[in-house]
């Protein structure tokens, strides 16, 4: 929960309320720590609101057992009908990496909300980004 001080009152808000998340939002999370945890927290809260969530990356993320690593828009669409969220990216050993931008454009609006891990710090406590980091999807909304 987040506390917001408004009109001389402290108001409890969920992360979804605090960020004012709406349908068709694309949310990229970047920084040196807590990206995956933040994405999981957002997804958990959005699922409670009966939203369909697509989780992907523009960098690399540790792969979950249920990650979809097959480049198939129809499979992703089918999985989103069966469950509330889908984790997807290209197979990269123990991790997944970003789909190419063309496929990302095809799948990004399959779900109500898309969550993207947009920056990697390789488990270091801080990072000095270069011109290429973080990679934020061109049609970024939040």
Predicted regions mapped to residue ranges:
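Residue-level preference for the first positions of well-ordered beta-strands
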Residues: 24-28, 52-54, 84-87, 113-115
